[in-house]
Regions:
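Short, charged/small-residue-rich alpha-helical element at the C-terminal edge
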Residues: 57-135, 140-142
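ABC transporter nucleotide-binding domain
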Residues: 3-94
Length: 146
């Protein structure tokens, strides 16, 4: 039913701007051109879907030994954790250009780097968690308003 509603709404909207408010992020993932995230009534940020999904990646770095986060974490790495020989994090400023070099310079013994695009729901969860963790400096650099 919701899918039919969305299809009909888009068909009738034409060139109009339509504002959709939903906690079901999966429903708007392929429809929205711009998104704004609210958390507990606060605007975290707004951005075009293209820019947002281009800069967020879930990264897994496989190393030749037990993985450890670098001593000085880049501010654009969130949810950093290590399990065995894999270091995992979310990169909020992903760019193909220098990504591999940056990771290799910060994490020793890199064997493989896997960076996957993230769904809108995962991006929101990551940003909401960062904002709630109280790191106002990091949140401000990410464009999250506290």
């Amino acid at each position: 039913m919701r899918e039919e509603f969305m299809e009909e709404l888009l068909r009738q909207a034409g060139e109009m701007t339509v504002l959709i408010s939903s906690h079901e992020l999966g429903e708007i993932d392929g429809v929205a051109t711009h998104v704004a995230f609210l958390d507990e009534g606060k605007l975290l940020f707004e951005e075009s879907m293209g820019d947002l999904t281009a800069r967020f990646r879930e990264v897994h770095v496989t190393t030749d030994r037990e993985a450890r986060p670098p001593g000085q974490l880049p501010r654009h790495w969130l949810d950093v954790k290590a399990m065995g020989n894999v270091l995992m994090f979310v990169d909020t400023r992903f760019s193909d250009d220098a990504f591999g070099e940056e990771v290799s310079s910060l994490v020793g013994g890199v064997r493989r780097i896997d960076a996957q695009p993230m769904a809108l729901r995962s991006i929101f969860t990551t940003l909401a968690r960062a904002a709630r963790d109280g790191d106002e400096v990091r949140a401000a650099r990410l464009g999250v308003r506290s």
